[in-house]
């Protein structure tokens, strides 16, 4: 289920925002009435979309938007009066916060939510790819350490050590990293 956080001091605004994001699959959004409460909720749970309806009772909300972008993967939307939105838009857009001037139409709001959700999905893909590449780097380092071990302790050339690891991996149906780990563990 999609998770959204609505940060707003007004109940009428909460109902309006919740009704419109429900159309996009965010049927049970979490609510926070202040910046402090929102930060606690963001620390406790991951959200796809965070909507900040300014001003908040304890702060305006633009700092919260910047914090949310830096500390979470959520797409962040800041709702502000048009005059204020124009003033803070450039600074917040540099951080990746979507700024929507009030009043806005339901279609504009839904489009902003869809863009924020797209940002979240894109970041999730980038994080997954990053984790995959990090794992690959760990495996390569492990294989290189095993090769160095074979070269130093068994007098093999680099090509022979590489071939031994590759052949053992194919014969045992293990990854090269697992074979390298076995070689290093066996000789410790």
Walk through the language-model features, giving the residues of each.
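Conserved phosphotransfer microenvironments
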Residues: 14, 35-39, 48-72, 83
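Short hydrophobic/Thr-rich beta-strand motif most characteristic of the beta2 strand and flanking loop
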Residues: 26-34
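The C-terminal output helix
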Residues: 115-128
């Amino acid at each position: 289920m999609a998770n959204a956080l609505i940060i707003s001091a007004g109940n009428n605004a909460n109902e309006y925002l919740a009704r419109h994001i429900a159309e996009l699959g965010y049927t049970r959004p979490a609510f926070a009435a202040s910046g402090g409460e929102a930060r606690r909720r963001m620390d406790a749970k991951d959200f796809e979309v965070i909507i900040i309806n300014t001003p908040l009772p304890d702060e305006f909300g633009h700092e919260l938007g910047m914090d949310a972008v830096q500390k979470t993967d959520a797409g962040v939307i800041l709702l502000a009066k048009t005059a204020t939105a124009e003033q803070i838009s450039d600074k917040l857009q540099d951080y990746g916060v979507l700024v929507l001037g009030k009043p806005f139409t339901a279609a504009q709001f839904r489009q902003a939510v869809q863009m924020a959700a797209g940002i979240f999905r894109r970041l999730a893909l980038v994080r997954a790819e990053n984790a995959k590449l990090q794992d690959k780097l760990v495996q390569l380092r492990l294989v290189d350490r095993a090769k160095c071990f074979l070269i130093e302790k068994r007098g093999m050339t680099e090509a022979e050590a590489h071939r031994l690891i590759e052949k053992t991996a194919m014969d045992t149906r293990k990854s090269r990293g697992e074979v390298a780990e076995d070689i290093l563990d066996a000789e410790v």
